[in-house]
């Protein structure tokens, strides 16, 4: 076996054995301690940390635009990485000596006993509920006032944009929407319970009966003949990557006869948006950029402040 890997594992075992038992048991929110070395283990937590004014001691790699999304690169310049969201490196986390770790039960429940021996863990139940992430992290990391202001500003922006959209669409309000993610070999439609779906719902957009009836956060469409399932007045659409195969799949889609019969294409309401913002960011900064995108593609004069 590789000697480097063996030494890293020995270091991890030794480091965990030297940590005080029960270090991760007390809830951070119940103490007056403000963590200074926070490690974030999912994208929405990293986004939220930056929004709260925290420069993490460590972050996981982004899903695309690696190693970190462009919109966060300046804020996170020089911040160490601790592996993938789906497989963070415990060895790297130990070496960074965090005093708090933000993780998600969805991704990291199996690792929680080990993580809690390294530092107190803030464990989020969901990775898609960005406002809950702000609330929990703000409370646990002693940034409650900042979190409250972020959420207040969010509500003001949503209320303002909703009013502008209602005026723009008039008697056609609320139009139904679908969010289409074009991938190499299939299309994924995001549902009301997803990260982008929750933002559109909060703005007052409608959903088709089929979308509302589906459980989960997305619907996988394996062939173009199933596209009518997600028919709507408006399509927000993005390409998963810049690869030629994704581009070919998109071009094949918009040339398909069924596509031409759908309401959004017929009404010229197919709007291309940023995939990182809409699908991968997962935090309140990304959600605010979604509002910017919506104001832009709908032609709201002056955007939304």
Curated annotation (Swiss-Prot):
<dbReference type="InterPro" id="IPR051313">
    <property type="entry name" value="Bact_iron-sidero_bind"/>
</dbReference>
<comment type="similarity">
    <text>Belongs to the bacterial solute-binding protein 8 family.</text>
</comment>
<feature type="domain" description="Fe/B12 periplasmic-binding">
    <location>
        <begin position="37"/>
        <end position="302"/>
    </location>
</feature>
<keyword id="KW-0574">Periplasm</keyword>
<keyword id="KW-0408">Iron</keyword>
<comment type="function">
    <text>Binds citrate- or chloride-dependent Fe(3+); part of the binding-protein-dependent transport system CbrABCD for uptake of the siderophore achromobactin.</text>
</comment>
<dbReference type="InterPro" id="IPR002491">
    <property type="entry name" value="ABC_transptr_periplasmic_BD"/>
</dbReference>
<protein>
    <recommendedName>
        <fullName>Achromobactin-binding periplasmic protein</fullName>
    </recommendedName>
</protein>
<dbReference type="GO" id="GO:0030288">
    <property type="term" value="C:outer membrane-bounded periplasmic space"/>
</dbReference>
<keyword id="KW-0410">Iron transport</keyword>
<keyword id="KW-0406">Ion transport</keyword>
<feature type="signal peptide">
    <location>
        <begin position="1"/>
        <end position="29"/>
    </location>
</feature>
<dbReference type="GO" id="GO:0042935">
    <property type="term" value="P:achromobactin transport"/>
</dbReference>
<keyword id="KW-0732">Signal</keyword>
<dbReference type="GO" id="GO:0042858">
    <property type="term" value="P:chrysobactin biosynthetic process"/>
</dbReference>
<keyword id="KW-0813">Transport</keyword>
<dbReference type="Pfam" id="PF01497">
    <property type="entry name" value="Peripla_BP_2"/>
</dbReference>
């Amino acid at each position: 076996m590789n000697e480097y890997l063996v030494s890293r594992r020995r270091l991890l075992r030794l480091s965990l054995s030297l940590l005080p038992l029960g270090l991760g048991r007390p809830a951070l929110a119940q103490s007056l301690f403000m963590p200074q070395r926070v490690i974030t283990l999912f994208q929405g937590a990293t986004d939220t940390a930056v929004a709260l004014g925290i420069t993490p001691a460590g972050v996981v790699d982004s899903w695309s635009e690696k190693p970190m999304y462009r919109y966060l690169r300046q804020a996170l310049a020089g911040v160490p990485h601790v592996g993938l969201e789906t497989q963070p490196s415990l060895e790297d986390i130990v070496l960074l000596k965090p005093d708090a770790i933000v993780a998600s039960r969805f991704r990291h429940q199996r690792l929680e006993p080990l993580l809690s021996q390294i530092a107190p863990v803030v464990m989020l139940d969901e990775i898609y509920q960005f406002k809950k992430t702000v609330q929990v992290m703000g409370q646990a990391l002693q940034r409650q006032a900042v979190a409250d202001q972020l959420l207040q500003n969010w509500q003001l922006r949503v209320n303002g944009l909703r009013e502008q959209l209602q005026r723009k669409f008039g008697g056609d309000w609320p139009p139904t929407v679908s969010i289409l993610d074009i991938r190499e070999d299939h299309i994924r439609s995001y549902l009301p319970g997803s990260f982008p779906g929750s933002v559109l719902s909060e703005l007052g957009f409608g959903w088709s009966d089929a979308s509302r009836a589906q459980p989960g956060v997305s619907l996988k469409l394996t062939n173009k003949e199933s596209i009518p399932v997600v028919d709507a007045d408006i399509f927000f659409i993005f390409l998963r990557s810049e690869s030629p195969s994704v581009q070919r799949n998109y071009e094949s889609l918009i040339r398909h006869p069924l596509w031409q019969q759908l309401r959004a294409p017929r009404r010229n309401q197919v709007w291309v948006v940023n995939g990182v913002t809409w699908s991968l960011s997962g935090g309140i900064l990304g959600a605010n950029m979604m509002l910017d995108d919506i104001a832009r593609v709908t032609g709201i004069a002056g955007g939304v402040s």
